Design a protein with these regions (language model features):
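N-terminal export/assembly segments and adjacent metallocofactor-ligating motifs
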Residues: 2-13, 17, 53-55, 70-319, ...
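N-terminal cofactor/phosphate-binding cores enriched in small/glycine residues
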Residues: 9-69, 78-83
């Protein structure tokens, strides 16, 4: 069933059970909101969406009031505009005036609403909160209760999206504040450090601790990608500055996960730029020695590669030009990696050399021990196409059915 109403003298037809806010947005009419989010339940906490409804007593919150047939709504009445300005002035009167250094400057919803409604910073009106900034030892989530506008988004996100119910409000009136559990540290209250609360916070009262002081929204390029940690296929936006990932933000239109991310997906990106990350193939020295029998490396070239690699590292430290540049690329790429003793030390090689070695060893094992000597594990981190090819390679090339799949590999 449908319902027909008028919004600012515009005739609108929507499904029965819709709210005034949903009806207005379907008609292209903008109503300011602060506590509302399309993924969460509506509570009407901020009172920014108040509108005038004909024959109704007082102003109505558009996000919680259901439409009715024949209803007449005015979103821009003098009474509604004055009420919104008053709400904004009250919020700003107890809000830190640190926009110049705030992490969410430029993407703060309170800032946007003040601009939209023409509200400037009000004069001091009574007491102000002075909470300790970032008192919680959680390694991923930063909290500044002085910025909190008590919209309740984090409370609903934690309960409705993550099903943890870590956040809630304590006390009443001016003393109302956001607390974890029974006013505990987040982790003591059962927090999973998923960061949903920070993702839904409109003002930066909750923020990603790893991204503090790194880059603002207008300084980063957002790149949509898929999480590599498991097979769910969560999508999110990498916030990239100067070729480096500085933050991960949720993508509300992600098909598998929406705004939801786990702690690994949201905060486990530092491995990308970690110095220990392997970016080139490593082969044990004993296998490179074996290739000499096939004439791949001439006699003495392995020793030459070792000496060249050591000299390259010394030259890099002293700033001198490396003598390794005069070596052929096949030898220059085989720079010994320190930390292991020959013959088990790892050597950096080019991809062709590594793949040739693997193919040759596979052929030797199959010839000497048969196909049943192979055991293969696929991974949920691979795409369906990659796993299909892996399965085909195992059965048709290696000639074995010993293939399994691990969701956490």
């Amino acid at each position: 069933m449908t319902v027909t109403l008028t919004i600012n003298s515009q005739r609108v037809t929507v499904a029965q059970g819709s709210t005034i806010l949903e009806a207005a947005r379907s008609a292209g009419v903008s109503i300011p909101t602060l506590c509302h989010h399309r993924d969460l339940s509506n509570v009407g906490a901020c009172r920014m969406c108040v509108v005038s409804v004909e024959n109704a007593r007082g102003l109505q919150t558009a996000c919680t009031t259901p439409v009715a047939d024949g209803m007449a709504v005015n979103t821009e009445s003098q009474e509604a505009r004055e009420a919104r300005r008053f709400v904004l002035e009250m919020l700003l009167s107890d809000h830190p005036n640190d926009c110049l250094t705030c992490e969410v400057n430029g993407e703060c919803e309170l800032q946007d609403l003040a601009y939209e409604c023409g509200v400037t910073w009000p004069e001091q009106r009574g007491a102000r909160h002075a909470y300790e900034v970032n008192p919680d030892p959680n390694p991923f989530i930063f909290i500044d209760r002085n910025k909190c506008v008590l919209c309740g988004r984090c409370v609903r996100a934690c309960g409705e999206v993550q099903n943890r119910d870590v956040w809630n409000f304590a006390s009443r009136g001016f003393k109302s504040k956001l607390v974890a559990g029974a006013d505990q540290f987040m982790l003591d209250a059962g927090c999973e450090s998923c960061g949903q609360c920070a993702g839904y916070c409109p003002v930066g009262a909750l923020y990603d601790k790893m991204s503090l002081g790194v880059a603002r929204a207008n300084k980063v390029k957002k790149v949509r990608t898929t999480c590599s940690y498991c097979g769910v296929g969560c999508s999110f936006d990498l916030n990239v500055r100067d070729g480096k990932i500085v933050r991960v933000t949720s993508a509300s239109d992600a098909p598998a996960n929406g705004m939801a991310l786990c702690v690994k997906g949201r905060y486990g990106y530092d491995y990308v730029h970690h110095p220990d990350r392997l970016t080139r193939p490593l082969v044990r020295a004993k296998w490179l020695d074996a290739t000499q029998r096939d004439g791949r490396l001439a006699s003495g070239e392995w020793q030459a590669a070792t000496v060249a690699g050591k000299h390259a590292r010394r030259s890099a430290v002293s700033g001198q030009q490396s003598a390794v540049s005069s070596q052929p690329s096949a030898i220059r790429d085989q720079e010994p990696v320190p930390g292991l003793q020959s013959p088990d030390r790892f050597i950096q090689v080019d991809w062709d050399s590594a793949l040739d070695l693997v193919a040759r060893r596979f052929a030797e094992v199959k010839r000497e021990h048969g196909s049943e000597a192979f055991s293969v594990f696929a991974s949920a981190k691979c795409t369906n196409e990659e796993n299909y090819l892996f399965n085909k390679f195992t059965r048709q090339v290696l000639g074995t059915n010993n293939i399994d799949h691990c969701a956490r590999l």
